[in-house]
Swiss-Prot record:
Cystine crosslinks: none
EC number(s) per entry: 4.2.1.19
CDD domains recorded: IGPD
Molecular functions per Gene Ontology: imidazoleglycerol-phosphate dehydratase activity
Catalytic reaction list: D-erythro-1-(imidazol-4-yl)glycerol 3-phosphate = 3-(imidazol-4-yl)-2-oxopropyl phosphate + H2O
Family per similarity comment: Belongs to the imidazoleglycerol-phosphate dehydratase family.
Record keyword Cytoplasm present: yes
Protein name: Imidazoleglycerol-phosphate dehydratase
InterPro entries: IGPD_sf, ImidazoleglycerolP_deHydtase, ImidazoleglycerP_deHydtase_CS, Ribosomal_Su5_D2-typ_SF
Any one Gene Ontology BP term: L-histidine biosynthetic process
Keywords per UniProt: Amino-acid biosynthesis, Cytoplasm, Histidine biosynthesis, Lyase
Source organism of the structure: Clostridium acetobutylicum (strain ATCC 824 / DSM 792 / JCM 1419 / IAM 19013 / LMG 5710 / NBRC 13948 / NRRL B-527 / VKM B-1787 / 2291 / W)
Pathway listed: Amino-acid biosynthesis; L-histidine biosynthesis; L-histidine from 5-phospho-alpha-D-ribose 1-diphosphate: step 6/9
Length: 197
């Protein structure tokens, strides 16, 4: 019987209290409450389009700003992905997705390599969308990548509408992650000549 690729992590600091529950072999079901409406929406899209079940509950110091809440959520989601992957046997390892959203086009490519790295290429023309600071998009993906052990490249190829560009990135991340964590029966062990990831 296949081992379930799920994880639950709870993290508490003086700034945030976070619970994340993830199922990499899910159906895209979600229950998200970070206290930041726009961020909730982006995580819901990531879950739905990545076919990953995701529950996130956050109590953060939003009276300061969104920084700690968004970054710490990225940390815990990254830790959950890494934990749920287990020994990483038979996974594709690599995933790439291009996602159009009206006038914008975004690309996310990843390698579940155990080597944490982020290349982010995207500029936004407004400071906030709702209560979400747009500069936190990059910080979220950095926190997630470094705690999941993923080499991640995320870029806005072109676009004008800030909402569309950010939405494209989160959808593309979900789809690329789904591809990378999917199992291939032809892969014996892990996808590495070193024998480990």
């Amino acid at each position: 019987m296949e081992e379930k690729r799920t994880a639950f992590i709870e993290r508490k600091t003086t700034e945030t209290s976070i619970e994340v529950d993830i199922n990499l072999d899910g159906e895209g079901k979600y229950d998200i409450d970070t206290g930041i409406g726009f961020f909730d929406h982006m995580l819901e899209l990531m879950s739905k389009h990545g076919l990953i079940d995701l529950k996130v509950k956050v109590i953060g110091d939003l009276k300061v700003d969104s920084h700690h809440t968004v970054e710490d959520t990225g940390i815990v989601i990254g830790e959950c992905i890494n934990k749920a992957l287990g020994n990483k046997k038979s996974i594709n390892r690599y995933g790439t997705s291009f996602v159009p959203m009206d006038e914008s086009l975004c690309q996310v490519s990843m390698d579940i390599s155990g080597r944490a790295f982020l290349v982010f290429d995207g500029e936004f023309t407004c400071e906030k969308l709702g209560d979400f600071q747009t500069e936190m998009v990059e910080e979220f993906f950095r926190a997630l990548a470094f705690n999941a052990g993923i080499t991640l490249h995320a870029r806005v190829i072109y676009g004008k509408n800030n909402h569309h560009m950010i939405e494209g990135l989160f959808k593309a991340f979900g789809r690329a992650l789904s591809e990378a964590v999917s199992k291939n029966t032809r892969i014996k062990g892990v996808m590495s000549t070193k024998g480990s990831i």
